[in-house]
Amino acid sequence: YSLLVQKIITTIDTDLTADLTLNVLAGKMNVNASYLSTLFKKETGNTLTDYVNEKRIQHGILLLHSTSLQIQTIASYCGIPDVNYFTKLFKKKVGKTPKEYREIFLKGGKKK
């Protein structure tokens, strides 16, 4: 990846709770938002928003596996304060709601 895209990825991975919108990230890097959007998509194959959401959902999965935190708290820790939006995104990416996912994981864990 180019240095700019590497910096964006590092910024995203470092703090998922930050405001990670295209305009904010472009401003932090002193580049045009349209340029950043095009470059990020060209180099990663994903839009910036999709990349951020993917990372947030991956973090949510990790927290569902490793903690007993409430879904609302997990959503906040993933940078999505609206639990309904988090649930919608999670279901779109994973195919199950966070609650369903946790229940399946816990049942699987008990069988082992």
Tell what function each PLM region has.
Residues 36, 40, 85-86, 90:
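Short hydrophobic/aromatic patch on the recognition helix
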Residues 18-33, 37-38, 42:
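C-terminal accessory/binding modules appended to enzymatic or scaffolding proteins
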Residues 15-20, 47-48, 97:
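Short helix/strand-capping hinge loops at secondary-structure junctions
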Residues 23, 34, 70-73, 83-84, ...:
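Residues within helix-turn-helix
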Residues 10, 14, 42-81, 103-112:
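Terminal helix-turn-helix DNA-binding modules in bacterial transcription factors
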Residues 88-112:
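…primarily DNA-binding HTH/wHTH and HhH modules…
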Residues 2, 19, 68-69:
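Residue at a beta-strand N-cap/secondary-structure junction
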Residues 28, 77-78, 93:
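Residues within the alpha-helical elements of helix-turn-helix
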